A protein has these predicted regions:
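Long C-terminal extensions of eukaryotic subunits of large macromolecular complexes
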Residues: 1-15, 309-312, 316-548
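Long amphipathic alpha-helical scaffold regions
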Residues: 4-16, 23-26, 69-154
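N-terminal alpha-helical scaffolding segments that mark the starts
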Residues: 6-70
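Flexible helix-coil transition and linker loops at the boundaries of alpha-helical arrays
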Residues: 31-37, 77-90, 139-157, 198-216, ...
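Amphipathic, non-membrane alpha-helical segments in soluble helical-bundle scaffolds
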Residues: 37-41, 62, 130-133, 155-156, ...
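Amphipathic alpha-helical repeat scaffolds of TPR domains
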Residues: 37-57, 83-121, 152-175, 210-214, ...
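Short coil/linker segments at helix-helix boundaries
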Residues: 53-71, 99-142, 168-197, 201, ...
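Non-catalytic interaction/regulatory modules that flank or connect domains
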Residues: 186-189, 262-340
Length: 548
């Protein structure tokens, strides 16, 4: 069971745009090509202009946006052909590949094969901007190698993006039953080394900056002296600009580093043999991250602010606490200990906290093969624990839903002309309700267990009610400025809920499903639902996809 982040942006975490790329995009705002590009730099700048056009269309027309991204990628490749060591072109092309992957592959509900007039993109060769993770990783490795050949400092954003891609590889491997765990450990090591290098560079650069601050004569920054306010404000703006590494930048890298540990821990399928190699690998690096984050919070946060830097917010501190708690939970293999961990009052009561708690419980259930089928063949004490786990998950998801719903009510008050991510929030609440429906569906099928059998009909009705509510909410528009990807997210959740309801109510003939959902929609979602054993009792395996 997976949940989208409590961040309501269409993408949770994409690649960073480097300063050189930003400068090129800014340049294109003032100039345009009046002649055919000739040099490597010409193609680089033209690619940057096309990429900016793709960004502008992303909210309203995914097909048009993708076509611009393809043009940009083609121009970056031309630039590389003309100059085999043009680092900016290598960086931009690798970053764009991951951006397109994030927007068009990872975003729930978006299917690139449903888009129109994108045949030039879907060529299944190296010229396409739509690539798999292996190709994206190789592109980042090529960019890093060019920087080494040039013997120039590797751009910090390139290092960060490379680490993020490696983490994504680990996360995707969770669904691969044939994954090689030793290979996953190697990827983890590479990702950790990437982020360790980045942290070293960022911390050193920030310490150098602090040294420069301390070298400024005290009177120069005395806001009590006449006419000093304006100069101090200008100096502070300069120091907190993106040209200088800030505490918030370092914390972002720390959070990304923790997510590497989280990703490898979620890949553990045999706790007894795999946990120790993972601990040996991640513990030294986690200690470094812990030390850095403690120093940042103690000296450069809203709890103890520094006047001349971008201080870490309380929200960011909360995010740090939540991900560290999740890592602690994934290190455990005892459900009762896990329940106690997430019950702590020291963890921020955010939607993300409660969704991760539910996910954490599900991870341990999966790791130990605690499924409805296996539990129904076990003694009562195992059923007690399984029931408690499902109940804890339901309680956590209910709290997440309440928090998200309150955020939804607040955002609805915002003037309709603003882009506030309301559509993504609607999709997220719908997903949480669907997850709760799945939990109740499992709770009503624990055979030979009194609480389940006694409340069977109530729990089944709860599941149906949650699905109906999810359908209704997912059908609610996200405002005038809703992005097209948000609409697709909502539509995906609506289909998820409707197909489940059809199965539970026995409306599962081909004609019924075609009429209610449309064939393309239900046949796309059916394989996912068939993997959930708790729908077997309702005849889901009797539904066959008709031949085309």
């Amino acid at each position: 069971m997976l949940f989208i982040s409590s961040n309501t942006n269409v993408i949770e975490k994409g690649p960073k745009l480097g300063k050189r790329a930003q400068a090129l995009l800014k340049k294109q705002e003032d100039t345009s090509f009046s002649k055919e590009p000739i040099s490597s730099e010409d193609y680089l700048e033209l690619g940057s202009a096309d990429e900016e056009s793709g960004d502008r269309w992303l909210g309203s027309d995914l097909s048009k946006s993708l076509r611009f991204y393809q043009k940009a990628y083609t121009n970056y490749l031309h630039s590389i052909q003309l100059d085999k060591v043009n680092l900016d072109s290598y960086y931009n092309s690798s970053r764009l590949l991951f951006q397109v992957y994030s927007q068009y592959f990872k975003t729930d509900g978006v299917n690139v094969y449903d888009l129109v007039n994108v045949n030039d993109v879907l060529t299944n060769d190296e010229s396409s901007v739509f690539q798999d993770l292996t190709a994206i990783l190789h592109a980042h490795e090529d960019a890093l190698e060019v920087a080494r050949k040039l013997n120039v400092p590797i751009p910090l954003d390139l290092i960060f993006n490379s680490g993020i891609v490696l983490t994504e590889v680990l996360e995707v491997e969770q669904d691969n039953v044939n994954s090689n765990f030793n290979r996953l450990l190697e990827i983890t090591h590479t990702a950790q080394e990437m982020f360790k290098k980045l942290l070293d560079l960022q911390v050193n650069e920030f310490q150098k900056f602090l040294g420069e601050l301390e070298a400024i004569p005290e009177g120069k920054l005395d806001v009590n002296q006449p006419n000093q306010d304006i100069s101090l404000s200008a100096k502070q703006e300069e120091y907190t600009s993106e040209e200088v590494v800030q505490p918030t930048d370092i914390l972002e890298t720390v959070l990304a580093s923790y997510k590497v540990a989280q990703a490898i821990l979620e890949n553990i399928t045999d706790y007894s043999t795999q946990i120790q190699p993972v601990l040996d690998l991640i513990n030294p690096f986690l200690s470094i991250c812990d030390e850095i984050s403690r120093d940042l919070i103690e000296n450069f946060s809203e709890t103890s602010p520094h006047d001349m830097v971008s201080n870490i917010s309380l929200e960011q501190i909360g995010e740090l606490k939540i991900i560290k708690t999740n890592i602690l939970g994934l290190l455990m293999n005892d459900l009762n200990q896990l329940f106690d961990l997430w019950s702590s009052d020291n963890i921020p009561k955010s939607a993300e906290r409660f969704m991760l708690a539910a996910d954490n419980i599900q991870s341990l259930l999966d790791r130990n093969d605690y499924t409805l089928s296996s539990i129904n063949a076990t003694p009562t004490d195992h059923k007690d624990l399984y029931w408690k786990a499902l109940t804890e998950m339901n309680n956590a998801l209910k709290q997440a839903q309440n928090i998200l719903h309150q955020s939804y009510l607040e955002k609805k008050k915002t003037p309709s002309g603003k882009d506030i991510g309301l559509g993504s929030l609607i999709a997220q609440i719908s997903e949480v309700m669907i997850a709760r429906a799945d939990v109740d569906l499992q709770r009503c099928q624990v055979v030979g267990y009194e609480p389940s059998e006694k409340n069977k009909q109530v729990l089944l009705q709860n599941s149906k009610t949650l699905l109906k509510n999810a359908m209704t909410l997912a059908n609610t528009p996200g405002g005038l400025r809703e992005r097209v990807a948000e609409k697709l997210q909502r539509e995906k959740k609506k289909v998820d809920a409707v197909l489940r309801m059809c199965v539970l109510e026995g409306k599962s003939t081909i004609d019924e499903l075609d009429t209610i959902l449309g064939r393309n929609k239900w046949i796309n979602e059916l394989p996912t639902l068939k993997r959930l054993a708790y729908f077997e009792q309702f005849g889901i395996n009797n539904i066959e996809v008709p031949p085309f």
